[in-house]
Amino acid sequence: MTFCIISHVDHIQINNQWLAYAPYVREMNLWLKYVDQLIIVAPNQKTEQTAIDLAYDHKDIIFYQVPTFDIKTFRSKIKTIGRLPFIFWQVFRAMQQADHIHLRCPGDIGLIGALIQVVFPKKKKTAKYAGNWDSKANQPWSYRLQKWVLANTFLTHNMQVLVYGEWPNQTKNIKP
């Protein structure tokens, strides 16, 4: 099985190994015991390994690099508009090759993944929403949009969304 991770977590390659934030990689390594090939779509901006980086425990990794982006200033908005076609393409082609799509949310890349996964209704999908799932929480617009897409069973065929805590009035694909 080819497993694809769409994530905003910054990565670094050292000695033919891909490393990222250790708690996140530790969790992913649990999943990777059951996959033949791993595709990662994420930023690769790091220049040095840090004490909190850990390597993925997998031998067959394909990495599609995407740039980080934000929309905090006018200049960054213009840069982001220019980068979006490339990011959308990287996410789309990775999803096309995957048997199972795994989104890491909330985050900018996770939002793009949540939107693109709609065109792959027959693929098995999971999303880990590692933020506050409380619908009453004061959150950025992009986080609320991600939660809406992920909870919408019309848009998320074959997807299970893993969230922290149990919340009232949730759709059947939301799993605490």
Task: Give the positions of each predicted feature.
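N-terminal strand-loop element at the rim of the active site
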Residues: 37-74
